[in-house]
């Protein structure tokens, strides 16, 4: 089986991609391998629990949020091809190599609310080309279609790397020698599914189309959908999307009525865009219920969006319900 270091040069050459772009991916992987070691030790290394501070999102930071964020920044800044970084945990962008060609955006530890109870978490990342001119916030505000690469590392029972350069999705598993080994090529998400993932405790806050959709699923084979569905909810986006990539399903984090100023909870640049590119490359769909996720023009680094992604039949149906 191919290791990442053997696979990557061939993949780049076959698809006429720059070697430096592959080098940025390897920097991300190096950082994630270090994060994986911290996650694995947990309480043994004293890295669990809260910091007592909050991030730009207004969320309480876990110790591992900060540790993972610092590892990503330090590792990526050491790569001269990286011009700048943007992190869910940082107020603004971070400048890097003066002559760098690439921008990297990331959620250093997605699902970190689960870390103290030993549930799967992960790192999500996106790579963009730096536009001409001085580095600024606007340099990062590109649509998801402009991503050169996207991926995630899942820290679960196995540590897995999943990424795409826009030429199919590839999955690697970390072995005992700390090498990522190719374990799945070009997975395809089934068009139809009987699984959905949503936080049902928020039902009273949802907009009517989402309430209708979930009611139809819960009605099962006697309802309008004519089949029984199972619900899943891990509260870790990386874990939810990985399951969908492996066997289908639909993941939803809809807008709700509590704060009209927030069109959703998840971040477009750090979470929704990279996951949408991966899923589209695997034959699935992703939207905010009104337009394809990858077509949304971002207005700020920390923009939030409603998220509906997974098996295309379900996402298409959700889009139709919202258009009525």
From Swiss-Prot:
Substrate binds at residues 110-113, 199, 265. The keyword Hydrolase applies. InterPro entries: FBPase_C_dom (IPR044015), FBPase_class-1 (IPR000146), FBPase_N (IPR033391), FBPtase (IPR028343). Its EC number is 3.1.3.11. Its cofactor is Mg(2+). Mg(2+) 2 binds at residues 107, 110, 271. It catalyses: beta-D-fructose 1,6-bisphosphate + H2O = beta-D-fructose 6-phosphate + phosphate. Mg(2+) 1 binds at residues 88, 107, 109. It comes from the Bacteria. It holds the Pfam family FBPase. Gene3D superfamilies: 3.40.190.80, Fructose-1,6-Bisphosphatase, subunit A, domain 1 (3.30.540.10). PANTHER family: FRUCTOSE-1,6-BISPHOSPHATASE-RELATED, SEDOHEPTULOSE-1,7-BISPHOSPHATASE, CHLOROPLASTIC. NCBIfam families: PRK09293.1-3 (NF006779), PRK09293.1-4 (NF006780). This is Fructose-1,6-bisphosphatase class 1. The gene is fbp.
């Amino acid at each position: 089986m191919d290791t990442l270091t053997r696979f990557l040069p061939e993949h780049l050459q076959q698809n006429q991609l720059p070697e430096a772009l592959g080098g940025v991916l390897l920097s991300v992987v190096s950082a994630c391998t270090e994060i994986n070691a911290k996650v694995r030790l947990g309480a043994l290394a004293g890295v669990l629990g809260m910091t007592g501070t909050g991030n730009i999102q207004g969320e309480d930071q876990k110790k591992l949020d900060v540790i993972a964020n610092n590892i990503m920044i330090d590792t990526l800044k050491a790569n001269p091809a990286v011009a700048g970084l943007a992190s869910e945990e940082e107020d603004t962008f971070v400048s890097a190599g003066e002559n760098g060609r690439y921008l990297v955006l990331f959620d250093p530890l997605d699902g970190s609310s689960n870390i103290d109870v030993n549930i799967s978490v992960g790192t999500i990342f996106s790579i963009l080309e730096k536009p001409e001119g001085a580095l600024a916030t606007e340099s990062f505000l590109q649509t998801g279609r402009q991503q050169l690469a996207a991926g995630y590392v899942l820290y679960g029972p196995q540590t897995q790397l999943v990424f795409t350069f826009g030429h199919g999705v590839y999955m690697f598993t970390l072995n005992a020698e700390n090498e990522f080994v190719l374990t799945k090529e070009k997975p395809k998400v089934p068009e139809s599914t009987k699984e959905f993932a949503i936080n049902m405790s928020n039902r009273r806050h949802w907009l009517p189309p989402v309430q209708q959709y979930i009611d139809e699923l819960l009605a099962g084979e006697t309802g309008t959908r004519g089949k029984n569905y199972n619900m899943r909810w891990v509260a870790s986006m990386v874990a939810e999307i990985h399951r969908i990539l492996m066997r289908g399903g639909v993941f939803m984090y809809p807008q709700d009525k509590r704060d009209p100023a927030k069109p959703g909870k998840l971040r477009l640049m750090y979470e929704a865009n990279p996951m949408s590119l991966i899923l589209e490359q695997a034959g699935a769909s992703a939207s905010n219920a009104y337009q394809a996720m990858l077509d949304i023009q971002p207005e700020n680094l920390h923009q939030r969006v409603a998220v509906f992604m997974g098996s295309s039949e379900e996402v298409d149906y959700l889009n139709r319900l919202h258009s009525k």
